[in-house]
């Protein structure tokens, strides 16, 4: 998972600035389906030249995953999410691996001097994802209503840039963007054109889990503040809380429980009790959030261990 902790704490390694230069040719696509559970690696150029996707695959819902700083497209948490999407909902999952642009080669040194480069690269990766989406729509006849993006940290903002670009390309809007603890550093005062924003898809869902490494303002149609969005149970490091957003969504995809969000106006107000929840006032985190009418900010109580349920057995 990506780790912005040393950046936020100001404990930068004063070594040589890493080279995290973006090059589209470095991007790989990890493609998962029920008959390719461990994933295959493709390049966009190959997709242009060969009819690789079978009609039976491409007709499914498609989830495009985008990782964050210092991470990879097949990181452990994304791999678990991809397998859950395949198993439960028979998705076609495409994980965008932009590890070089995300400075993954320097992850072992914990050198975050390349963070500003990675931030700049998010726009390039967003354009890449939009161009890939155009290929899916025009060559493979995939409707935009079948495509959702799921991005963690810098990947959340990258998803936003992709959402803006597909609209510029006149493709319409993605069905949904799910922003998993959208990155805070370099985005703390950003306006909509420069970050993930609720207009970037038909529905934008944000799951906030770290006030240190993530943004603490609303960016979506619904914004879930898990455990008040500050830090997470069982986590002593901000990076642990930051990564929990990915794990929470994966458990919600498995549908072992519903993480319920109850309306919450601000950090200084007391959220309503889960026991008072009705389907028209509260929202379940996850792939079905869009089916609930309520929008805005929601407080989500969680337990320390998976599947993290703290919903008093309530069914919405």
From Swiss-Prot:
The keyword Transmembrane does not apply. It catalyses: a 1,2-diacyl-sn-glycero-3-phosphocholine + H2O = a 2-acyl-sn-glycero-3-phosphocholine + a fatty acid + H(+). It is found in: Secreted. The active site is at 153 (nucleophile), 181 (charge relay system), 242 (charge relay system). Residues 5-14 form a propeptide. Its EC number is 3.1.1.32. Residues 1-4 form the signal peptide. CDD domains: Pancreat_lipase_like (cd00707). Keywords: Allergen, Cytolysis, Disulfide bond, Hemolysis, Hydrolase, Lipid degradation, Lipid metabolism, Secreted, Signal. GO terms for molecular function: phospholipase A1 activity. GO terms for cellular component: extracellular space. Coiled coil: none annotated. One of its GO terms (biological process) is lipid catabolic process. Disulfide bonds join 20-103, 192-197, 235-240, 257-284, 258-309, 277-282. Its main location: secreted. SUPFAM superfamilies: alpha/beta-Hydrolases. Expressed by the venom gland. Belongs to the AB hydrolase superfamily. Lipase family. Catalyzes the hydrolysis of phosphatidylcholine with phospholipase A1 activity. May act as an allergen and induce hemolytic activity. This is Phospholipase A1 4.
